[in-house]
Design a protein with these regions (language model features):
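A short acidic, often aromatic-flanked loop/helix-cap motif at beta-alpha or helix-coil junctions
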Residues: 55-56, 85-89, 142-150
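Active-site neighborhoods of divalent-metal-dependent phosphate/nucleic-acid chemistry enzymes
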Residues: 77-122, 126-130, 155
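Short amphipathic alpha-helical segments and helix-helix/interface helices
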Residues: 33-38, 69-70, 106
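PIN/NYN-family metal-dependent endoribonuclease catalytic core
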Residues: 8-61, 78, 142-144
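Short, electropositive alpha-helical surface patch
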Residues: 59-74
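Residue-level signal for well-ordered alpha-helical positions
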Residues: 20, 60, 93, 130-131
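Acidic, PIN/NYN-like endoribonuclease modules and their adjacent C-terminal/linker elements
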Residues: 1-6, 21-30, 110-156
Length: 156
């Protein structure tokens, strides 16, 4: 894990550690997300945030959760600010079937030259795979991505 990844986590990922951990998938995704966040905290990787993330997070009805999620984002080293460029790219992505927020997150991740955009939303991952040739960022599930980049015993 020597590469310096630039990582954009969507709101689903940022909320995952605070979800009820009753299902195996949720627990495993949480572990992967916490490991990713830890690598960002130590400076091994770079966490990216955006105005779009903050706007969506602030729509969360639970004030305590908002504060917890924003606390995670406070370690971000790069912040993407919205601008005219965002509107045009969001419109392009919405024509492909992305929701407004998903399109804005993808556009923000692209703008920041993110290496990876992580989401626990299976529908968004599938849509992104369908249109991967038209996106400037890879979109993946955090557990699947983290499992791919962890060095295996043979790599050591």
């Amino acid at each position: 894990m020597n590469e310096q990844y630039r990582i954009y986590l969507d709101v689903c990922c940022l909320n995952r550690p605070f979800d009820r951990q009753t299902q195996a998938r949720i627990r495993l995704e949480t572990e992967a997300i916490l490991a990713i966040i830890n690598n960002c905290q130590t400076g091994t990787w770079t966490l990216i945030t955006s105005n779009v993330l903050e706007a969506e997070i602030n729509q969360t009805p639970n004030r305590e959760r908002i504060e917890s999620v924003l606390n995670i984002l406070s370690i971000a080293k790069v912040k993407v600010l919205s601008g005219d460029w965002l509107k045009g790219r969001v419109e392009q992505l919405q024509k492909l079937g992305f929701t407004a927020y998903d399109a804005a997150h993808v556009a923000s991740a692209e703008r920041a030259s993110s290496d990876i955009f992580l989401t626990t939303d299976d529908r968004l991952v599938r849509k992104s795979q369908t249109y991967s040739q038209l996106l400037k960022v890879e979109v993946s599930n955090p557990l699947q991505w983290f499992a791919q980049i962890i060095p295996t015993e043979e790599d050591k």
